[in-house]
């Protein structure tokens, strides 16, 4: 991606310090390449790629874009723009051997290499019509299906037919699930539409439920062994310690947030900003 030197210099001066406990600093600012606007691509979710790249997913236009130093600008999907297309892509993730795309309507996982070349695909049986997914650092994928109100485990290109977590067993877990995430230890976090966060072990054992105390939480973000919630206005809070964070205004409006180690990547309308998080 191209970077604006003047923007970067000014953004490095922006620091958010809250309660002398956590520090957010803007480490990088990456404006979208011009091809994004030329092709009228509007990514609404994204994921860290490899070698400093990012994967941008436009769920409306069914388009996946890779931007960064590894491949420059590359795209796959869309309506008639490429040899291969998606029906309803709802999630993109990076595995040790490539990129995974979860297609809800087709009930399948599509595998691409890091240059977005098609490799293979796996059909999901039973037909989950998946809504959300998350992947851990070992390549285990966890898929939420509202049809079953359950989380399924997908490993080594095989879907376990028995739910990893049957949410129907928990009366305190709402049927409306907003986010599903996995942390560095493989533990699962669920953000419900009612602002409650539910935590499970990597084996699917229930740990605890915690009420979020920020208005309209939209994003659930694991950073190391801590869990945070953020809303679209950039207000954030660690759900256990209740320490607040504020995303700098330059990163607003927020369309998606993803973490890697101690860094946050913020997807906005025309750029990605990267924040370093210092935990004291």
Regions inferred by a protein language model and the residue ranges of each:
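Short loop/turn segments that connect beta-strands within beta-propeller blades
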Residues: 68-71, 113-116, 155-158, 201-203, ...
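Conserved beta-strand positions in repeat-built beta-propeller and related beta-rich domains
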Residues: 49, 56-60, 101-106, 143-149, ...
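Repeated scaffold domains used in trafficking and secretory/extracellular systems
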Residues: 41-47, 86-92, 128-135, 173-181, ...
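A short helix->beta-strand "capping" segment at the edge of beta-propeller domains
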Residues: 21-42
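Short coil/turn segments that connect the beta-strands within blades of beta-propeller domains
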Residues: 51-52, 96-97, 138-139, 185-187, ...
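Surface loop/turn motifs at the tips and blade-to-blade linkers of beta-strand repeat domains
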Residues: 35-39, 78-84, 122-126, 165-173, ...
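Blade-level signature of beta-propeller repeat domains, shared across WD40, Kelch, NHL, RCC1
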Residues: 252-280
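Beta-strand-rich domains and repeat architectures in extracellular enzymes and scaffolds
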Residues: 35-62
């Amino acid at each position: 991606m191209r970077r604006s030197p003047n923007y970067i210099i000014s953004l490095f001066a922006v620091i958010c310090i809250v309660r002398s406990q956590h520090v957010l600093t803007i480490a990088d600012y990456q404006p979208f390449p011009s091809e994004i606007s030329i092709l009228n691509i509007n990514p609404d979710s994204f994921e860290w790629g490899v070698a400093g790249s990012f994967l941008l997913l436009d769920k409306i236009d069914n388009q996946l874009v890779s931007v960064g130093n590894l491949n420059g600008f590359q795209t796959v999907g869309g309506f008639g723009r490429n040899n291969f297309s998606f029906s309803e892509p709802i999630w993109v993730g990076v595995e040790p051997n490539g990129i995974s795309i979860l297609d809800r309507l087709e009930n399948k996982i599509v595998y691409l290499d890091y240059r977005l070349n098609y490799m293979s695909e796996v059909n999901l049986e039973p037909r989950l019509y998946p809504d959300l997914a998350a992947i851990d650092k070992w390549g285990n994928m966890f898929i939420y299906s509202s049809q079953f109100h359950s989380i399924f485990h997908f490993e080594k290109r095989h879907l376990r037919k028995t739910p990893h977590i049957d949410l129907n067993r928990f009366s305190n877990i709402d049927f409306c699930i907003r986010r599903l995430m996995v942390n560095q230890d493989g533990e699962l976090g669920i953000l419900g539409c009612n602002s409650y966060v539910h935590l499970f072990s990597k084996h699917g054992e229930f740990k605890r439920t915690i009420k979020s105390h920020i208005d309209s939480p939209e994003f659930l973000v694991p950073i190391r062994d801590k869990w945070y919630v953020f809303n679209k206005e950039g207000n954030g809070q660690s759900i256990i310690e209740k320490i607040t964070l504020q995303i700098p205004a330059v990163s607003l409006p927020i369309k998606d947030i993803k973490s890697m180690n101690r860094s946050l990547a913020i997807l906005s309308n025309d750029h990605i900003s990267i924040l370093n998080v210092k935990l004291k």
